[in-house]
């Protein structure tokens, strides 16, 4: 999901949510590595259900970053088997294993998939060009390059999309491998495997969510079932919270351990020997994994989201749903994040603080079972809008300070004459203090009328030039003698021809030193001739003026003028650009400049456009919330803009009515035509390729080879926004569907929707019943089964692919030497999940046993009292001080300190009314306000009646 750095931020804020995975090491006997005993006790604790988001496995196995990529698709699939087996040995599920591969996505997700795949094709093209350049350079140096190496191209990662031949092969390979494990591994005898391949519509993680919701709807469901999901996406954390399952955790690679590894580049791979490649493969096989405990995260959130003295009952489940919803504003796969929010800048904390301040006045929460309370959302965004300009200014100031710090570090690194605060232990005279002229006033040899500092800075170049060519030394001396009477520290006194001739003499024997010297002298001369253009020294501690601030912005070029930026009504120029250049979010007037730069509209049309964008964004956040909590509300809806509105623009949204039409998902080939670039058309049947490449095609404009990439204020190129035209669904489907009659039978078989597949071993409790009802009876009937018996509920149907007992399943891979499997050792059926009778409720089910608490009182206090208290000023006007979740409390100084206060409290408990002498001061001064002080305190005395 598009929440960059969310896992890193979350694990640092709540450190106890992660723990390392304990792995059993395989034993080696006589040089043979024995497999791990799957049936043995799990050192990480027992687990019922494991869910694999397979795209998080297929991608790193097919194009890894830290090791050489597999040569063939068979090798990729063998790597998938090995990786999956390692994950299973860590988790060891006992009841259910669900393998979910991304199928056809909703239209809202296709826009992001389209951007990624077009960008991937562009990067692959650049990588192949770079490889060709490196090989050409090697050949120019006389190295012999094999033709096979020159002809080899990188594997197209866009093949990992539903409907391609690779995905069809992946589905067959997964069915074979799980059947092989069920037939041969005793630890799998009670395991029930569900495979949801690319022919089942929906994203992998959301198909898993649908499965969990369907199991919770079964009346026999065990509320203490333990769940684990494997994947790399940040949205798995939101999905884990959205299940409202008390025993849930996430398994993922340890990204912190991988930060220290240097990723080998492409030309490094070309130079590696077989031993070096094998060492990288072995190193990659040992990378550590982490558990992310959603139950511990729930503990943290119970402290973080606690709002005392609410006018309504505090419901942790509803509060967690609100927290998940607010995180959507910081980024997701379906909508751009709000301009003022960024996870790395603690935007989630800002939203939580606003939510806690606004919630008492809302009378209810922001969400309820996936539906939005738009009145509450409008109030939260209004508060965020009030802070928006301050957020932009603070971000700009931080960027300026960071840039200045980088410049200082660069200057200290490049300038060898800066002592960096250390005492110079060399008692010789520094080079800056050495005289450039002799005692008679004559210029020193080789000085070229430079200052002492210039001479010291260029001592290396002059020394190399003098040592490398005596003719250059003589020329420098002659130039010094000729200008003896015109000495100056400036370089403007000698002509261009003289400089060129002096440098030209030295080119023969020491070109590099002479060229460096020439460049530095010419640079000094240019600065001397144009003193107005030379940069002035900058004081890092001085606040920048208005002109300096303008010059320091990214718009320091011609676009940084104070006038309105030019409006473009057509397609932007292909290549990298930054539309934030002229917006200047840190200056007044940024609102109109933002819409002019991002949406290309004149000033008079901004208000009408803003309303349309806000309405679409409200529809978007409503769609995303329903997608996470109830399933896909519409397969055809999408956000029709590349950018988000400001938080201050969300006015009057409480009156909006948001509804969705469910529609139906695209077929696989229709999605391929929606998201693939023309460079990846080899993944499509031949009949569709001309639609992408033929200029006469009615949808040719959907597949530009060059397109603009907006940095959008980001520093890293991979975060840039790809500005592609949105697909016109009507035109696309009309063009694609007229080609369907030309498809072959094998091609039609990849363009269908199917059910999930259920695989069990012949020792499973359901085996005899399923075999008799589905494959022995002449009229097979669907078999319904409940959760209590095996931990799985649903309906089994006869296999649509023609599974037959007493036959063999053939291995689909030519590599690996894997055997064929007897179909008597396992059973394969089609599987359908139980139907949900009503919308899923965001509650903990009755009968659950809470997990053991992992947070200490100190951990909870660190969250509840996260703001420091010692700098809060004491005010005698209200006598209130902040005290964490209780917000404020009454306090006044008391004679005798805290011990006297405790004594007074004990006295008031023993005697309901204090004696009269306690109301007067012994010195005759004003009476102490003991009564009001006690009644206003939260330490209320007991009254006896």
Swiss-Prot record:
It is found in: Nucleus. Keywords: Exonuclease, Hydrolase, mRNA processing, Nuclease, Nucleus, rRNA processing, Transcription, Transcription regulation, Transcription termination. Its main location: nucleus. InterPro entries: 5_3_exoribonuclease (IPR027073), Xrn1_helical (IPR041412), Xrn1_N (IPR004859), Xrn2/3/4 (IPR017151). It is an enzyme of class 3 (hydrolase). GO terms for cellular component: Las1 complex; nucleus; RNA polymerase II termination complex. The keyword Nuclease applies. GO terms for molecular function: 5'-3' RNA exonuclease activity; RNA binding; rRNA binding. Its EC number is 3.1.13.-. Residues 474-495 have a biased composition (Basic and acidic residues). Residues 543-561 have a biased composition (Low complexity). It comes from the Eukaryota. One of its GO terms (biological process) is nuclear mRNA surveillance. Residues 473-510, 524-564, 912-945 are annotated as: Disordered. Belongs to the 5'-3' exonuclease family. XRN2/RAT1 subfamily. Interacts with RAI1; the interaction is direct, stabilizes RAT1 protein structure and may stimulate its exoribonuclease activity. The interaction also stimulates RAI1 pyrophosphohydrolase activity, probably by recruiting it to mRNA substrates. Possesses 5'->3' exoribonuclease activity. Required for the processing of nuclear mRNA and rRNA precursors. May promote the termination of transcription by RNA polymerase II. Essential for vegetative cell growth and chromosome segregation. This is 5'-3' exoribonuclease 2. It comes from Eremothecium gossypii (strain ATCC 10895 / CBS 109.51 / FGSC 9923 / NRRL Y-1056) (Yeast).
């Amino acid at each position: 999901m598009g929440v960059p750095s969310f896992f890193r931020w979350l694990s640092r804020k709540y450190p106890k949510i992660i723990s390392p995975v304990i792995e059993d090491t395989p034993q080696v006997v006589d040089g043979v590595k024995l497999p791990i005993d799957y049936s043995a006790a799990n050192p990480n604790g027992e687990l019922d259900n494991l869910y694999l988001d397979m795209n998080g496995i297929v991608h790193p196995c097919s194009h890894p970053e830290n090791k050489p990529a597999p040569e063939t698709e068979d090798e990729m699939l063998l790597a998938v088997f090995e990786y999956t087996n390692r994950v299973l040995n860590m988790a060891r599920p006992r009841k259910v294993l669900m393998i979910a591969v991304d199928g056809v996505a909703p239209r809202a997700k296709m826009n992001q998939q389209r951007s990624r795949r077009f960008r991937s094709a562009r990067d692959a093209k650049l990588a192949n060009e770079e490889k060709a350049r490196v090989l050409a350079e090697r050949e120019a140096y006389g190295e012999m390059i094999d033709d096979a190496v020159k002809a080899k191209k990188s594997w197209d990662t866009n093949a990992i999309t539903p409907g391609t031949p690779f995905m069809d092969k992946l589905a067959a390979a997964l069915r074979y491998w799980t059947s092989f494990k069920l037939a041969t591994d005793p630890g799998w005898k009670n395991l029930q495997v569900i495979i949801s391949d690319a022919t089942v519509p929906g994203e992998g993680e959301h198909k898993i969510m649908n499965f969990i919701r369907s199991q919770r709807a079964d009346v026999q469901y065990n509320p203490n079932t333990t769940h684990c999901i494997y994947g790399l996406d940040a949205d798995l954390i939101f999905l884990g919270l959205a299940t409202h399952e008390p025993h849930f955790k996430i398994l993922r690679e340890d990204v912190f351990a991988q930060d220290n590894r240097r990723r080998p580049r492409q030309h490094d791979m070309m130079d590696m020997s077989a031993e070096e490649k094998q060492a990288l493969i072995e190193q990659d096989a040992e990378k550590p994994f982490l558990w992310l405990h959603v139950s511990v995260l729930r503990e943290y959130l119970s402290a973080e989201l606690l709002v005392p003295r609410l006018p309504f009952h505090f419901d942790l489940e509803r509060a967690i749903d609100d927290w998940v919803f607010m995180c959507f504003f910081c980024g997701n796969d379906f909508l751009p994040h709000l301009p003022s929010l960024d996870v790395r800048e603690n935007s989630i904390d800002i939203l939580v603080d606003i939510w806690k301040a606004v919630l008492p006045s809302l009378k209810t929460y922001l969400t309820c079972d996936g539906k939005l309370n738009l009145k509450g959302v409008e109030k939260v965004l209004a508060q965020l809008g009030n802070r928006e300009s301050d957020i932009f200014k603070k971000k700009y100031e931080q960027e300026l300070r960071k840039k200045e710090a980088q410049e200082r570090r660069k200057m200290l690194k490049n300038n060898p004459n800066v002592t960096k605060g250390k005492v110079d232990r060399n008692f010789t005279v520094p080079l800056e203090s050495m005289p450039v002229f002799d005692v008679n006033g004559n210029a020193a040899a080789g000085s070229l009328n430079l200052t002492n500092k210039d001479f010291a800075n260029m001592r290396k170049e002059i020394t190399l030039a003098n040592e490398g060519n005596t003719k250059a030394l003589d020329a420098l001396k002659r130039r010094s003698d000729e200008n003896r009477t015109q000495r100056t520290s400036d370089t403007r006194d000698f002509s261009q021809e003289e400089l060129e001739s002096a440098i030209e003499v030295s080119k023969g024997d020491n070109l590099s030193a002479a060229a460096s010297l020439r460049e530095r002298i010419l640079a000094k001369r240019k600065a001397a001739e144009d003193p107005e253009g030379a940069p002035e020294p900058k004081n890092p501690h001085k606040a920048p003026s208005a002109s300096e601030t303008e010059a320091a912005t990214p718009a320091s070029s011609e676009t940084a003028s104070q006038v309105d930026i030019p409006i473009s009504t057509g397609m932007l120029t292909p290549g990298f650009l930054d539309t934030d250049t002229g917006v200047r979010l840190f200056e007044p007037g940024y609102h109109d400049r933002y819409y002019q730069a991002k949406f290309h509209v004149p000033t008079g049309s901004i208000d009408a456009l803003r309303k349309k964008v806000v309405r679409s964004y409200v529809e978007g956040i409503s769609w995303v919330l329903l997608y996470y909590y109830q399933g896909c509300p519409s397969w055809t809806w999408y956000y029709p803009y590349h950018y988000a509105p400001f938080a201050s623009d969300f006015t009057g949204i409480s009156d909006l009515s948001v509804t969705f039409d469910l529609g139906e998902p695209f077929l696989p080939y229709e999605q391929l035509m929606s998201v693939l670039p023309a460079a990846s058309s080899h993944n499509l049947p031949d009949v569709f390729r001309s639609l992408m490449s033929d200029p006469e095609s009615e949808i040719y404009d959907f597949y530009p080879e060059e397109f603009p990439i907006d940095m959008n204020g980001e520093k890293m190129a991979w975060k840039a926004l790809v500005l592609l035209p949105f697909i016109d669904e009507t035109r696309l489907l009309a063009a694609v569907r007229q080609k369907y009659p030309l498809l072959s039978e094998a091609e039609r078989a990849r363009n269908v929707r199917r059910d999930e597949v259920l695989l069990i071993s012949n020792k499973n409790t359901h085996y005899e019943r399923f075999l008799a009802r589905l494959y022995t009876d002449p009229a097979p009937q669907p078999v319904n089964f409940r959760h209590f018996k095996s931990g799985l509920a649903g309906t089994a149907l006869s296999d649509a692919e023609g599974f037959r007992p007493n036959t063999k399943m053939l291995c689909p891979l030519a590599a690996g030497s894997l055997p064929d499997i007897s179909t008597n050792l396992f059973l394969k059926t089609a599987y359908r999940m139980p139907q949900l009778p009503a919308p899923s409720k965001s509650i903990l089910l009755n009968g659950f046993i809470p997990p053991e608490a992992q947070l200490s009182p100190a951990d909870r206090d660190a969250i509840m009292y996260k703001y420091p208290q010692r700098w809060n000023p004491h005010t005698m006007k209200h006598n209130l001080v902040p005290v964490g979740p209780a917000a404020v409390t009454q306090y006044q100084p008391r004679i005798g300190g805290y011990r006297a206060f405790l004594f007074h409290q004990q006295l008031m408990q023993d005697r309901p009314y204090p004696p009269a002498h306690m109301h007067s001061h012994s010195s005759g001064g004003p009476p102490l306000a003991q009564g009001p002080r006690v009644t206003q305190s939260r330490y209320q005395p007991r009254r006896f009646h």
